[in-house]
Amino acid sequence: LPDDAISIHNLSKKFKNPDGKGFFYALDNVSLSIPRGSIFGLLGPNGAGKSTFINILAGLTIKTSGEAVVWGNNIDQHPKASRSSLGVVPQELTIDPFFTPKESLEQQAGLYGVRPKDRNIDYILRMLDLEDKAEAYSRTLSGGMRRRLLVAKAMVHRPPILILDEPTAGVDIELRVQLWKYVRKLNENGTTIILTTHYLEEAEELCDKIAILDKGKIVKSASKQDLLEDADSKTISVKVRETPDLNHPILLELGANINDNNELTVNFNPKIINSREIL
């Protein structure tokens, strides 16, 4: 088995500007590795490039340049094998209201070419607590159940990697926590999870490693622990008219120093004191 579920090297995707003049990069020279068996968070605001990243991996968008390897398969050299290694759960609740969950999964399994004797539909329904609703019309399911049905459809061909695109966007806290439980359950059963989100709380709660994407570039990629430690340390610089006494107890505690341009720099923990209080 590969050490990395997904390995990305210098991946770029450019699109034409809406006015037809010139181009913009939705992804700009992105490189990252997603460890096998991890819950990996791709964090960023709307328009950061998260959906473009997913669409390239899923074969829905053609990259401009770079390399992407999914479960040991290069997406250019082995497109079918790489796509079959992925299950993608879209943000939109797209279900057929006239199909039951069991019928939906049977249909999805057929589309993936899974033979009837190899289908594990009852197991998936049971794992996602949809067994009692297996024969109910999908239109009668609650919002949380519909989300879980989308997860079930993505897992029907037993992919080793599951991508969840903004799975809790627009849902309440109770439903969000409920979905987190199922994500952990899937991961404990061996599935590598890739979670795109703009909720810092969600990434902090679930993920082992987090990459922050903004304007098509990776701003930071590190373990959750390293990112949280970075968040505990901030620096502020201000230009002062008069040189302060650096031996003052508060300035000593903040590790203050001053340069030749009379710029005073202090380090602080934003959980203890904020920049306004310092100023």
Please give the residue ranges for each predicted region.
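ABC transporter nucleotide-binding domain
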Residues: 180-269
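Conserved ABC transporter NBD signature motif
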Residues: 66-74, 81-82
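Conserved ABC ATPase "signature" region
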Residues: 106, 110-133
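Conserved ABC ATPase signature
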Residues: 137-141
